[in-house]
Amino acid sequence: GGGHGMGGGGGGGAVRLATTTTLTISGRVLANGGRGGDGTSGCCGAGGGGGSGGAIMLVAPTLRVVTGATVTAIGGVGGVASAPYGGAGGAGGVGRIAIQTTPSTCTLAGTFNPALVDACNVTTGAGTRGRVHISALP
């Protein structure tokens, strides 16, 4: 954006993991926004905004996200202001996670941010905005 102050954090980008067999995630899949820059003293010390969370798409007939695994697409934190000029930067917006799988062969025991709505069940209706979206493979 315009104006004075520090730069915003980078966006989270996009990650797509797809297979025609089994996808097992036992580590971390991240598409998180970067931290905004801190303000500088003396002039124009507003902190930069955090980068927006990115997008993650997991596609597999059989999907396993094991306990201890993490799948996140969150916004970065805003930078710190430098007194007395400016304010702190705002946080970046939440990203999106989409899953296409066969619900009967899906196990989601890991941590998701944004959060799951209803485990491996197909996501429908209201109350799902800002959450993990799950659809059945055709």
Predicted features, each with a name:
Residues T62, P103-S104:
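Short, polar loop motifs at secondary-structure junctions
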Residues G1-R16, T24-M57, V66-T101, L108-P138:
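Glycine-centered low-complexity coil/loop motifs and glycine-rich tracts
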Residues T20, A60-P61:
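Parallel beta-helix/beta-solenoid
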